[in-house]
Amino acid sequence: MAKDDVIEIEGTIKETLPNAMFKVELENGHEILAHVSGKIRMHYIRILPGDKVTVEMSPYDLTKGRITYRFK
């Protein structure tokens, strides 16, 4: 899969799950399961419920995503 095949959308963290997984409510109202990208994990950026984040999603599976940015 090429990098340009991803869908980027903003959302809000609703719930923290085990293994660095999160329930994210997207702007359009859908709720997806998302994990933290390697760069965020590498820099020990904490993500808490209520944080606004950017999520990358594959067009093939719209129920899962990757958190790539946490807004300040």
Curated annotation (Swiss-Prot):
The chain positions of domain S1-like read 1-72
The terms describing its cellular component in GO are:
cytosol
First-listed, main subcellular location of the protein, grouped into a coarse class: cytoplasm
- Compartment(s) of residence: Cytoplasm
The record's keywords, sorted A to Z, are: Cytoplasm, Initiation factor, Protein biosynthesis, RNA-binding, rRNA-binding
Which GO molecular function annotations are given, in alphabetical order? Answer: ribosome binding; rRNA binding; translation initiation factor activity
Q: Which InterPro entries match?
A: NA-bd_OB-fold, RNA-binding_domain_S1_IF1, S1_domain, TIF_IF1
SMART domains, per this entry?
A: S1
One Pfam short name: eIF-1a
Q: Which domain of life is it from?
A: Bacteria
Q: What CDD domains does the annotation carry? A: S1_IF1
What is the recorded function of this protein according to its Swiss-Prot or TrEMBL entry? One of the essential components for the initiation of protein synthesis. Stabilizes the binding of IF-2 and IF-3 on the 30S subunit to which N-formylmethionyl-tRNA(fMet) subsequently binds. Helps modulate mRNA selection, yielding the 30S pre-initiation complex (PIC). Upon addition of the 50S ribosomal subunit IF-1, IF-2 and IF-3 are released leaving the mature 70S translation initiation complex.
Q: How does it assemble?
A: Component of the 30S ribosomal translation pre-initiation complex which assembles on the 30S ribosome in the order IF-2 and IF-3, IF-1 and N-formylmethionyl-tRNA(fMet); mRNA recruitment can occur at any time during PIC assembly.
Task: Name the protein family.
Answer: Belongs to the IF-1 family.
- In its UniProt entry, what is this protein called? Translation initiation factor IF-1
